[in-house]
Structure formats: C-alpha cells, structure tokens
C-alpha cells in the first residue's frame, strides 16, 4: 500500500486538467487552507459524496503513560473528526471487494 501526498494530487491535477505545477499547487493549497479556516471559524465542512469534517471538544480524563504505566491527566482539547459519506464509503468498499 502506498501513500497519496499533496505532490501526487498536484501531479494528478496537472495531468488531468492540463494545469501548470504552480496552478495545481495553488489549487491544492487553497483547498486545504479553506478547509482549515472553516474549521477554525467553527464551521462544519460538508463535502457532498465524500464526508464531513468537524471540530469536537474532548473532556479532560485520566490517562496512563504507556512507557511507565504512571497515571497522568489528559487535558481537555479540541480535535478534528472526519466521518465518511455513504457514497464515498460504498465506492471504496466496492473497489476493495473487486480486487
């Protein structure tokens, strides 16, 4: 299994949309900047057919240091969550089962 990187996405856009490297990079960077800014502004990001990103608050809780086993307090924090959309999930499942 390999990894898809931003560079791979830029390369794909260059090949399929006939963009220059700079145009592809600008498109990819702007997409991720917009996604980040929307989450920072407290907006949920819904990408139809793909999934939803949102910020969730996690309460503080007791935890444990995995190396020492010593109890530690895990502080409250805000995390980004992603929930796949049904259409995207089905596409991935179909392709995985076809292999």
From Swiss-Prot:
Presence of keyword Transcription: yes
Pfam families with a match to the protein in the record: Bac_DNA_binding
Signal peptide residue numbers: none
Database matches in SMART domains: BHL
GO cellular component: a single term: cytosol
Keywords for the protein's UniProt record, in alphabetical order: DNA recombination, DNA-binding, Transcription, Transcription regulation, Translation regulation
Record-linked InterPro entries: Hist_DNA-bd, Histone-like_DNA-bd_CS, IHF-like_DNA-bd_dom_sf, IHF_alpha
Complexes and interactors: Heterodimer of an alpha and a beta chain.
NCBIfam families named among the record's database cross-references: PRK00285.1
Entry's family note: Belongs to the bacterial histone-like protein family.
Protein name: Integration host factor subunit alpha
Organism, as annotated: Psychrobacter cryohalolentis (strain ATCC BAA-1226 / DSM 17306 / VKM B-2378 / K5)
């Amino acid at each position: 299994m390999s990894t898809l990187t931003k560079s791979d996405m830029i390369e794909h856009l260059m090949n399929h949309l006939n963009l220059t490297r700079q145009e592809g990079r600008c498109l990819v960077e702007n997409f991720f900047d917009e996604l980040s800014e929307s989450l920072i502004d407290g907006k949920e990001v819904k990408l139809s057919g793909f999934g939803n990103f949102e910020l969730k608050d996690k309460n503080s809780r007791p935890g444990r240091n995995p190396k020492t086993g010593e109890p530690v307090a895990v502080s409250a924090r805000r995390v980004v969550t992603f929930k796949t959309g049904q259409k995207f999930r089905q596409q991935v499942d179909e392709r995985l089962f076809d292999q």
